[in-house]
Regions:
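Short beta-strand immediately N-terminal to the catalytic nucleophile in serine-hydrolase-like folds
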Residues: 2-4, 29
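Flexible "cap/lid" loop of the alpha/beta hydrolase fold
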Residues: 13-18, 22-57
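Gly/Ala-rich beta-loop-alpha elbow adjacent to hydrolase catalytic centers
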Residues: 4, 8, 12
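Catalytic active-site module of serine/aspartate enzymes centered on a nucleophile-bearing elbow/loop
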Residues: 148-183
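Conserved alpha/beta-hydrolase catalytic His-Asp/Glu region
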Residues: 43, 57-111, 116
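Conserved serine/cysteine hydrolase catalytic core
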Residues: 92-145, 154
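Short, well-ordered alpha-helices that flank and scaffold nucleotide-derived cofactor binding pockets
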Residues: 17-21, 142-145, 172, 176
């Protein structure tokens, strides 16, 4: 059973398509999906994305990290600083390590998964936060409906990383998927 969030969801989908006999179930949290339609941003979010591009071009990892916390932890339409304390510190620490790491390189196993989701026959669950980007919420709903044995669940009050904000709920959902796979 593979569990993946965001880009990890893309990797899990690719693995399920490339190696179906090795995958018994999927839990996808706000997954990126190769081949999915390009995001269309409403004006307010377009401004945030433009700002992110400017910050990334400047190259300051601390500024990039802080703004990514704003987008992915707080949620793009939520007040900045919505999530505080240990959760925010954990995000900044983990994401800071990733930002300072050497580039990982390109995936050699990338698959145009969006057009092939109906080939995935294992029990699958898609989770997303109600404070995540609108296009990610919509894509998550689409993925859940396109997977033959998929279910979809919005997590109220979470953004892009519900496993950080609501670990008990996410863990319970994973256990539900494990039970579906065992049954």
């Amino acid at each position: 059973i593979l569990v993946g969030c965001s880009q990890g969801g893309r990797i899990a989908l690719d693995a399920a398509l490339l190696h179906p006999s090795r995958v018994r179930g999927l839990v996808l949290i706000a997954p990126t999906v190769a081949g999915a339609p390009a995001a269309v941003y409403p004006p307010g979010i377009r401004l945030l994305m433009d700002r992110m591009e400017t910050i990334e071009a400047a190259g300051d990892p601390d500024q990039i990290n802080a703004f990514k916390a704003r987008l992915f932890l707080d949620g793009p339409l939520s007040p900045e600083g919505r999530v505080q304390g240990e959760i925010r510190e954990r995000f900044l620490d983990m994401n800071g390590i990733a930002l300072r790491a050497a580039p990982a390189g390109a995936s050699r196993d990338a698959v145009a998964a969006f057009q092939r989701l109906d080939e995935i026959r294992v029990p699958s669950m898609v989770l997303w936060g109600s404070h995540d980007f609108p296009h990610i919420q919509e894509r998550s709903r689409q993925v859940a409906s396109m997977l033959m044995r998929g279910s979809g669940h919005a997590l109220a009050g979470a953004a892009h990383l519900p496993s950080l904000e609501q670990p008990e709920i996410v863990s319970q959902r994973i256990l539900e998927l494990i039970a579906r796979c065992a049954g």
